[in-house]
Each structure stands twice: as C-alpha cells, then as structure tokens.
C-alpha cells in the first residue's frame, strides 16, 4: 500500500504539525503485520531530515517526496537536505515543456528537469 498524508506547507504550525504526523505514522507502522511494507508519499518537511527514521524503517519500502507548493528549483534544494527521500515531482518534469517546442528543445528541457530532480534525490 501507499500512504499519502499531507500537511499544508503554508501552515503557521507546519513544523509542529509534521512532527505530530510523523508520530502518527510511526504508531501506524508498529501496528502493521510483520512482513508488510508501505510506501509513504510525503511533502518535503520543514525540518531537514525529519523523516530520516522512516527511510530506514523495516516496514517502509520508500519515502517519496512530493513537491506540491514549491517551484522545481526550491523542491530540489529542499529535497537535497533530506537523505533517503526520493522525488515524485511530476509537475517538475512537465512545467517547462510546451507543445510549440521542436523535438530537440523538448528533449533537452525534459532531460534538464530529469537531471536536476535525480541529483536532488541522491544528494
């Protein structure tokens, strides 16, 4: 299964709310049957590394970062501060693509976005 809990990145109490959400996720993981794993899709946390414990949890297959609310550059910069999280930035891949681009420009634009997002995922 994939779980996608989100906390509003513009909320005034974001840091506190993300910590409460993390505690709830950790409690849920304890309740999972042995041998079952989940994938988590989470907004990039305000506190760098907040979800680090989840990335190594035996019941977590992957922790995927959502870029919602951030520009691609900002999302990549924030993701790079969170080792173990990988990007799920579909908007970031597509935002600079245009129907009017010729094949070479389209391919170059897509490649540049992929390179930027991949680099942030392995930082």
Task: Annotate each PLM feature.
Residues 49-54, 71-83:
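Catalytic cores of alpha/beta
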Residues 20-27, 49-53, 108, 112:
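Alpha-helical scaffolding segments of alpha/beta enzyme cores, especially the outer helices
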Residues 34, 56-63, 81-87:
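Glycine-enriched alpha-helix->loop->beta-strand junction motifs that scaffold or abut catalytic
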Residues 10:
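Extended, alpha-helix-rich binding/interface surfaces that flank or overlap catalytic cores
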Residues 4, 13-46, 62-68:
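Catalytic beta/alpha-barrel core
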Residues 96-118:
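C-terminal helical cap(s) of enzyme catalytic domains, especially alpha/beta-barrels
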Residues 3, 90:
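Conserved, mostly hydrophobic/aromatic
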Residues 45-49, 69-73, 92-94:
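Short Gly/Pro-enriched loop/turn and capping motifs at secondary-structure junctions
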């Amino acid at each position: 299964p994939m779980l996608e809990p989100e906390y509003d990145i513009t909320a005034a109490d974001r840091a506190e709310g993300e910590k409460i959400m993390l505690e709830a996720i950790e409690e849920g993981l304890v309740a999972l049957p042995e041998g079952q794993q989940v994938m988590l899709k989470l907004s990039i946390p305000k506190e760098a590394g907040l979800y680090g414990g989840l990335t190594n949890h035996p019941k977590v297959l992957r922790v995927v970062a959502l870029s919602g609310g951030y520009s691609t550059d900002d999302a990549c910069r924030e993701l790079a501060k969170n080792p173990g999280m990988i990007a799920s930035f579909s908007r970031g891949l597509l935002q600079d693509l245009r129907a009017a681009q010729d094949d070479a420009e389209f391919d170059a634009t897509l490649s540049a976005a992929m390179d930027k997002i991949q680099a942030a995922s392995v930082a």
